[in-house]
């Protein structure tokens, strides 16, 4: 219609009026001759127009009101049937209509006039034009007028003139459109005024047409009649129709339905028409198409089937398309039928053209995803409904399959290769001969599909996403067109692609909307789809969303099987890269969509299809599960056994780009990869890269495929897990074309990017990826068992890559990731292990390097999580794994050492996880790490970790693979202890804080903390741990380690022990030191005595260390000494401890055990330790000499070879001396107060130990077994030297019993012989009067005792006799050396010979006891001189015992081993008697000395008249000196005994007298021995005896008659004996004649003569009253006998005789008679 603005403007109105007038004038001119009425009417009209123009303000309205009159002239003109006039009139009428100045009445008149012209066949085109203008410019034509106008157009359509027909057809279409447009306009006009009825949704009863508004009614009537006409029924409204075609009717119906769907949807009347008229009509008209089967025999059916008619069928399909598209919601049931029909039309038995238009129709549906969604909701989701959507998709699939199964009749359908006839490859064939280039037939010239010999080209039919049909648009065709080869397949292919694209876009859009509505934020990244967890789509709380989800799922479930079947077939058949790309993209899209919706089975099915496409033909059959339906229940295997090597026929046209080995346990040849395989692989990579978040469990499928492809292509892992092309020699049968070679880096890059993109996956998806890789790796591991073939490392490499890019959330995947890699590290295949370790250590290092939020230093849990796998590697026995682990630790220390913090325990645990079976190199590497820790990182680690450092250092000490490391580790322990010392305050503070925290936590949990050395303070526990570890090393099997550890332990305790709390010392003593002593003692006593030949290599072992026993002895010595030193230096700390007494006892027990050891070294050292704890060796005080603390210097371990594992750390420099640190940090040691340590119980315990040691060690052996152990002299010396100091502490309570015990030990000690081996070093030469150290010690011990007794209380002095007894025993050794049990000892003189035979068997040599005995004698004499008057000495008959003791050497005299002995004995006797005799005389009445006198007499007798002979070489001077000694004895008798004869027992005096008589002459015996003669030659002695005798007889006043009698008898006997000797000599001389008498006889007579001379002299000197007269008579009676001797021939006798006779001159003057008388009487 014309615009109002253009027709109502003044200019337009003016122009209209002018034109009207002009038209009327022209009409008047034309008709003035032939048609006067018309002329008049025209002129009348001119006037009318003028009047209207002149009078009316609104010209157009006025014209319209008078239009019937205005138009009348023109109508009349048309009635003339004159062409020119008619044309003029029609033009004028059109002008009026265009200005909308025609009223309804006028319009009716015009239509009637037009009808007449039509019936007359005039101006047909003008008529059509006029009708069109009339209906389009205004809405005044209704009802019958409108009907008549439309019929007029229809009638003109069926003329014989094509132009008219076509113009009429176009006019009809336009008119029909105008009618409906009017209705739409009418609805728009009234929509606000009147509420519209609700759109119809189902069957409703027909409402009365009268309810419709005018335009609506016209439209209704028109549409109804169109249906009638198409159905070949009479119209109701279009009265006058004479002819109609169905094709045209269907076109009109389609245009109305397509252009005005809202009319039918908003008006029930129209909806009713659709349901009741249109749908049945369509179904009815479809009937021929449904029933017809191409190629079926007509005779087989009862009635001939009508052949489908292309124009109608095609138009019906168009109508159906519109119905489905526009009115699906109204016609649910009907559409179900239509859709089912569409599907049927695809059947193979339908004509090609029908299938083509059907597939085009379906294509139109496929580009409408919302429509498809509706189908799914309305049909597929209803319980008992046809699954329409599924059927459509399946039908497309079947259709495509059928095209390959039934070759089309076109010339291009000839097959290029018979099925199965392509070249196949066998395992033995040369892979290069199977055609590495494209096939040579025409099949590759055009894009096409080829399957089993059927070749179908791909045609370009429409642009993506549109359904531009070809045959549905052929409205002008009457005959069925020829469908070109490939057209239907190409459309069907596009149907599939558009279907996938459409539903994917729609569902993803709805998902996105659902997310937005549910406020779910999806994290997006470039080139990645939003990663949504399928389980979260959409939020299930919203029922609407639930509904949406169920629709999406149903759509997928309905279509995926058909889609997959079709796409898989097409993928297999495709020879075109673009087509393949589209197919793969569709499959990928579907897989992604299924993944988003959590539909596992379809997702896996599509992925499987892509995977199959990626792998060589038939390879996939064993790798992937071919059953799509059951795919979700299957596990995907990568094993690939039984791979079929036959190339299928469908791939003969494919370009082979690579030939390689399959990944299988037993490869049976080679497999080929085509360009399509590589293309599929890329799609697979793309899928995983972009849609990894939705893969879930199908990751395994994807990765398994990629692994096989990577293997076939020869890609190998490199650093970081990226895959790089392997070396050319990797596989002898791997052949790669140039094309694929250039692709490999790209594929490798995409692979890496794929795993890099895992950082954008959500957590669940990431877990799926990790699980899949782990599963894949497990299978690769299984394949590698018992197989030397290179394993597949794909999974391990990609686990590494995945881990590295997901460090920001490493926690969620760490455990499964590292857990699996640890399993890999345990695999027997070295290459597999190597990569497992590489991956694991790289991840750990990367994890520690990564900047986590919060930082690792603040996230202890994460740090421990990262380090834990490193620790778990320690459990793996493989050498290479441990090496890798330790390399990793070293790198961690170097890069992260300062920030490890809470991770230290784990790292240290790894370093310390050493085992002896690991070999030297591993231990060296681990030790290198430890050295670095100790030198560089002690200050940075938490103090709580220091204990672990100690444990680890200790474990290196204990390992037995590398001695130098053990020794160096002990040095490290010293450095560690020094560090503890330097930073003691800091460490203690940190440990205490930690302890408080632990105690608090334990209290909250209600548990008790259980820690070693509890309840010592934490810092002390640290020290105790260090000590305990050193203690363990002290009992190592290697001597060097034991020695170094022992030195370090005691140095550490000595240097740093002051830091310990007082109470902790209890633990040190009991848990460390005593425990160590126990272990050392046990090991020492059970050590092997076998000789060790050498120390390995060229090292010679000293004989003192050539058995394990001797080596352990050294350890025992060191340990005991160390403990004793601690007891000594720290006693002020130890003594206040609760159990010090018990500890003291234990220590003494250890000392005793050691002292009684069979090892001289140990036993001697034990005594030194004993001395130390008794403080015989006084300890150096700290406050006196701070620089020289005992044991402060750190021991330097002895290195047998170089230690190459020195860490790259800095040495720990100690800037200050330990003494300074001690004074700075610790309280100075207090001097030990006497009262502190004077605890008698301790000292008595020591005494008891000493006694037990002494008793056991000096006990003589029972048998003379060669193996008898004899204690050494140094040992015994040390033992005895202990006593004096010990005695100082026990002297107050030292009893007689104790003294006797002591005596036994002293006696035993000096009785012990020495080995001939040792004698040259201990024995003095026989001539030297030197005491051994032992003998000196023994005498010193006794000296100490006697001095204490001397100054001690009275009750102590009873011990004197015991001391004398002891000394007496020692004195006796001079003559009778002690026997040590039954042991045979050699005399010292014989031992000299053995000193030369160095290697002769050891013999036992008795010591030279003479000096010792003599010294003892001197001591005894000295002591007696001091103590002679003591009551105990008197009471216990000490003097008698002394004399008895002296009697032995005196009686032996010349027979004594040493001449000095008897001489000393004599002098000692003289000294003793000079003191003792006065005491004896004092106590003579008490009888206490009664037994002493006979002993003394015997002693004198034995000495003065010894039976021993002097040696032959005795000189005269010596003899005279000896005689002088005898004289001294006699003088003692004359001075000390005889003067006091009245106080002395008479028996004793008698014996003395007899002895003196015997001494004066010796001529009583009848035979003279040499000895007697010698004695007799002691003239001076005889003289003294005689003089003494005489003095004794006459000098003293006779106090008793008995005494005088004894004197007289003595003289009488003397004279009688002289008389007898003289007589016998005279007689013998006479008988001898001239022969001289024996010398002894001559000597005897000379002696007698001298005695007579002496007697007379003595008698002269004696007071006369003392001489009995009888004596004088006897003297004088000798004279005659003397005279008789004058005849003797011996001059010597003559001389003596002369001397004897001379004194008789005094008898020549007789005395007074009275006196003589008296004398005779």
UniProtKB/Swiss-Prot annotation:
Q: Does the keyword Transferase apply?
A: no
The cross-references to InterPro entries, in alphabetical order and at most eight, read: ARM-type_fold, DCB_dom, Mon2/Sec7/BIG1-like_HDS, Mon2/Sec7/BIG1-like_HUS, Mon2_C
An example Gene Ontology biological process: protein transport
Cite the residue spans of the region called Disordered: 414-439, 516-539
UniProt keyword annotations, A-Z: Protein transport, Transport
Q: Which Pfam families match?
A: DCB, Mon2_C, Sec7-like_HDS, Sec7-like_HUS
Quote the biased-composition stretches of kind Basic and acidic residues, using this chain's numbering.
516-526
Q: Could you say which protein family the record assigns here?
A: Belongs to the MON2 family.
**Its job:** May be required for traffic between late Golgi and early endosomes.
Name this protein carries in UniProt: Protein MON2 homolog
């Amino acid at each position: 219609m014309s615009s109002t603005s253009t027709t109502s403007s003044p200019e337009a109105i003016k122009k209209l009026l002018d034109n009207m007038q002009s038209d009327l004038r022209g009409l008047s001119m034309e008709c003035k001759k032939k048609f006067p009425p018309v002329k008049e009417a025209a002129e009348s009209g001119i006037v009318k127009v003028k009047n209207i123009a002149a009078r009316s303000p609104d010209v157009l309205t006025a014209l319209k009101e008078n239009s019937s009159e205005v138009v009348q002239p023109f109508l009349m003109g048309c009635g003339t049937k004159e062409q020119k006039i008619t044309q003029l009139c029609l033009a004028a009428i059109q002008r009026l209509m265009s200005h909308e100045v025609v009223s309804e009445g006028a319009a009716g008149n015009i239509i009637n006039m037009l009808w007449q012209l039509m019936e007359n066949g005039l101006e047909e085109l003008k008529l059509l034009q006029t009708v069109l203008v009339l209906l389009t410019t205004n809405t005044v034509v209704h009802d019958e007028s409108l009907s008549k106008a439309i019929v007029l157009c229809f009638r003109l359509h069926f003329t014989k003139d094509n132009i008219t027909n076509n113009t009429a057809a176009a006019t009809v279409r336009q008119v029909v459109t105008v009618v409906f447009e009017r209705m739409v306009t009418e609805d728009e006009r009234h929509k606000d005024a009147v509420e519209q009825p609700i759109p119809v949704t189902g069957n409703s009863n027909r409402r009365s047409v009268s309810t419709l508004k005018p335009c609506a009614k016209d439209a209704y009537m028109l549409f109804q009649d169109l249906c009638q006409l198409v159905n070949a029924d009479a119209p109701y409204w279009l009265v006058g129709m004479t002819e109609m075609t169905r094709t045209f009717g269907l076109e009109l119906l389609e245009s109305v339905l397509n252009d005005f769907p809202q009319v039918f949807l908003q008006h029930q009347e129209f909806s009713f028409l659709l349901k009741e008229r249109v749908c049945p009509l369509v179904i009815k008209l479809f009937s021929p198409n449904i029933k017809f089967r191409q190629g079926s025999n007509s005779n087989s059916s009862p009635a001939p089937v009508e052949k489908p008619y292309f124009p109608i069928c095609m138009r019906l399909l168009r109508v159906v398309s519109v119905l489905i598209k526009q009115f699906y919601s109204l016609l649910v049931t009907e559409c179900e039928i239509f859709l089912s029909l569409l599907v049927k039309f695809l059947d193979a038995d339908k004509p090609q053209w029908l299938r083509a238009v059907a597939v085009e129709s379906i294509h139109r549906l496929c580009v409408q995803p919302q429509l498809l969604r509706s189908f799914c909701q309305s049909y597929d989701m209803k319980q008992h409904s046809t699954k329409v959507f599924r059927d459509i998709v399946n039908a497309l699939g079947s259709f495509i399959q059928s095209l390959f199964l039934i070759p089309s009749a076109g010339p291009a359908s000839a097959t290029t290769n018979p099925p199965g006839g392509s070249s196949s490859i066998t395992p033995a064939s040369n892979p290069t001969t199977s055609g590495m280039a494209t096939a040579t037939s025409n099949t590759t010239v055009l894009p096409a599909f080829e399957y089993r010999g059927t070749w179908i080209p791909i045609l370009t039919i429409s642009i993506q996403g549109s359904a531009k049909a070809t045959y549905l648009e052929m409205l002008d065709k009457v005959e069925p067109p020829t469908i070109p080869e490939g057209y239907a397949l190409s459309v069907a292919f596009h149907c599939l692609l558009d279907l996938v694209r459409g539903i994917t876009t729609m569902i993803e859009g709805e998902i996105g909307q659902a997310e937005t509505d549910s406020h779910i934020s999806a994290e997006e990244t470039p080139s990645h789809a939003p990663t949504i967890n399928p389980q979260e789509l959409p939020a299930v709380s919203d029922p609407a969303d639930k509904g949406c989800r169920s629709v999406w799922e149903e759509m997928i479930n309905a279509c995926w099987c058909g889609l997959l079947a079709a796409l898989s077939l097409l993928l297999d058949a495709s020879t075109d890269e673009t087509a393949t790309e589209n197919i793969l993209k569709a499959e990928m899209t579907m897989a992604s969509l299924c993944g988003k919706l959590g539909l596992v089975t379809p997702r896996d099915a599509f992925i499987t299809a892509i995977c199959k496409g990626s792998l060589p033909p038939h390879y996939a059959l064993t790798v992937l599960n071919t059953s799509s339906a059951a795919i979700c229940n299957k596990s995907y295997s990568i094993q690939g056994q039984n791979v079929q090597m036959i190339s299928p026929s469908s791939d003969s046209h494919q370009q082979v780009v690579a030939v390689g080995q399959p990944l299988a346990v037993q490869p049976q040849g080679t497999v080929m990869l085509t360009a399509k395989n590589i293309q599929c692989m890329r799609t697979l990579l793309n899928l995983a890269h972009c849609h990894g978040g939705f893969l879930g469990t199908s990751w395994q499928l994807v990765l398994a495929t990629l692994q096989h492809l990577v293997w076939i292509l020869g890609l190998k892992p490199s650093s970081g897990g990226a895959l790089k092309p392997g070396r050319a020699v990797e596989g002898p049968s791997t052949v790669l074309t140039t094309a694929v070679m250039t692709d490999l880096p790209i594929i490798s890059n995409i692979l890496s990017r794929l795993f890099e993109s895992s950082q954008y996956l959500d957590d669940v998806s990431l877990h799926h990826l990790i699980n899949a890789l782990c599963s894949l790796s497990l299978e690769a591991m299984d394949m590698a068992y018992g197989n030397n073939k290179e394993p597949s490392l794909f999974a391990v490499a990609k686990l590494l890559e995945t881990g590295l890019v997901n460090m920001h959330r490493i926690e969620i995947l760490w455990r499964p990731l590292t857990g699996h890699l640890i399993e890999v590290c345990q695999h027997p295949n070295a290459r597999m292990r190597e990569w497992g370790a590489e991956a694991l250590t790289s991840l750990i290092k990367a994890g520690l390097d990564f900047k986590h939020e919060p930082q690792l230093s603040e996230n202890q849990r994460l740090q421990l999580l990262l380090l834990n796998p490193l620790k778990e590697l320690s459990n793996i026995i493989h050498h290479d794994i441990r090496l890798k682990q330790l390399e990793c630790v070293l790198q961690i220390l170097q890069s992260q050492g300062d920030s490890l913090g809470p991770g230290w325990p784990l790292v240290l645990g790894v370093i310390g996880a050493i085992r002896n079976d690991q070999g030297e190199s591993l231990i060296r590497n681990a030790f290198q790490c430890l050295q670095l820790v100790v030198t560089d990182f002690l200050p940075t680690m938490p103090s709580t970790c220091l204990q672990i450092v100690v444990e680890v250092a200790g474990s290196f000490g204990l390992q037995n693979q590398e001695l130098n490391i053990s020794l160096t580790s002990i040095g490290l322990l010293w450095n560690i202890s020094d560090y503890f010392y330097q930073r003691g305050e800091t460490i203690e503070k940190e440990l205490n804080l930690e302890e408080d925290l632990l105690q608090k936590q334990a209290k909250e949990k209600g548990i008790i903390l259980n820690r070693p050395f509890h309840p010592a303070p934490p810092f002390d526990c640290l020290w105790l741990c260090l000590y305990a570890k050193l203690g363990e090393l002290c009992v190592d099997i290697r001597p060097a380690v034991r020695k170094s550890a022992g030195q370090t332990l005691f140095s550490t305790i000595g240097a740093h022990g002051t830091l310990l709390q007082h109470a902790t010392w209890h633990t040190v003593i009991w848990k460390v030191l005593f425990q160590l002593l126990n272990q050392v003692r046990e090991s020492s006593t059970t050590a092997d005595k076998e000789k060790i030949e050498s120390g390995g290599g060229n090292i010679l072992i000293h004989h003192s260390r050539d058995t394990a026993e001797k080596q352990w002895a050294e350890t025992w010595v060191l340990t005991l000494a160390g403990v004793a030193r601690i007891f000594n230096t720290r006693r002020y700390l130890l003594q206040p401890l609760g159990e010090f007494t018990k500890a003291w006892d234990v220590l003494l027990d250890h000392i005793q055990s050691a002292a009684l050891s069979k090892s001289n070294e140990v036993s001697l050292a034990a005594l030194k330790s004993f001395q130390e704890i008794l403080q015989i060796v006084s300890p150096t005080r700290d406050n006196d000499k701070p620089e020289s603390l005992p044991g402060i210097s750190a021991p330097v371990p002895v290195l047998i070879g170089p230690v190459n594992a020195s860490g790259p750390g800095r040495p720990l420099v100690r800037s200050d001396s330990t003494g300074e640190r001690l004074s700075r940090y610790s309280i100075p040691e207090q001097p030990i107060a006497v009262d502190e340590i004077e605890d008698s119980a301790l000292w008595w315990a020591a005494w008891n130990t000493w006694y037990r040691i002494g008793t056991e060690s000096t006990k003589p052996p029972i048998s003379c077994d060669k193996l008898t152990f004899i204690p050494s002299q140094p040992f015994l010396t040390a033992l005895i030297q202990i006593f004096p100091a010990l005695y100082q502490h026990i002297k107050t309570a030292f009893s007689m019993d104790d003294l006797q015990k002591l005596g036994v030990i002293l006696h035993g000690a000096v009785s012990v012989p020495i080995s001939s081996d040792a004698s040259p070093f201990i024995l003095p030469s026989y001539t030297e009067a030197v005491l051994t150290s032992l003998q000196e010690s023994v005498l010193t011990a006794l000296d100490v005792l006697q001095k204490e007794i001397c100054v001690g209380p009275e009750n102590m002095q009873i011990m004197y006799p015991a001391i004398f007894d002891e000394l007496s025993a020692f004195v006796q050794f001079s003559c009778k050396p002690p026997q040590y049990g039954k042991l045979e000892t050699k005399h010292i003189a014989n031992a000299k010979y053995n000193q030369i035979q160095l290697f002769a068997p050891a013999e036992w040599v008795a010591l030279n006891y003479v000096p010792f005995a003599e010294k003892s004698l001197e001591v005894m004499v000295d002591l007696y001189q001091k103590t002679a008057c003591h009551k105990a000495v008197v009471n216990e008959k000490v003097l008698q015992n002394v004399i008895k003791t002296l009697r032995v050497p005196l009686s032996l005299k010349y027979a004594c081993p040493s001449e000095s002995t008897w001489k000393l004995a004599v002098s000692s006797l003289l000294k003793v008697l000079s003191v003792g005799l006065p005491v004896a005389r004092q106590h003579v009445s008490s009888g206490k000395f009664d037994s002493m006198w006979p002993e003394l007499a015997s002693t004198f007798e034995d000495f003065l008249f010894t039976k021993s002979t002097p040696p032959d070489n005795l000189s005269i001077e010596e003899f005279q000196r000896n005689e002088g000694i005898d004289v001294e004895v006699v003088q003692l008798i004359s001075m000390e005994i005889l003067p006091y004869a009245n106080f002395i027992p008479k028996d004793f005096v008698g014996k003395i007298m007899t002895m003196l008589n015997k001494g004066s002459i010796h001529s009583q015996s009848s035979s003279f021995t040499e000895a007697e003669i010698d004695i007799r030659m002691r003239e001076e002695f005889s003289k003294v005896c005689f003089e003494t005798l005489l003095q004794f007889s006459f000098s003293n006043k006779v106090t008793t008659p008995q005494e005088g009698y004894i004197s007289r008898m003595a003289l009488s006997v003397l004279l009688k004996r002289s008389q007898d000797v003289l007589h016998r000599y005279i007689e013998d001389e006479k008988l001898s004649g001239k022969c001289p008498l024996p010398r002894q006889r001559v000597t005897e007579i000379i002696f007698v003569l001298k005695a007579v001379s002496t007697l007379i002299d003595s008698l002269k000197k004696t007071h006369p009253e003392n001489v009995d007269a009888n004596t004088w008579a006897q003297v004088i009676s000798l004279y005659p006998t003397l005279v008789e001797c004058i005849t003797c021939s011996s001059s010597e006798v003559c001389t003596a005789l002369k001397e004897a006779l001379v004194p008789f001159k005094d008898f020549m003057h007789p005395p007074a008679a009275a006196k003589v008388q008296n004398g005779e009487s």
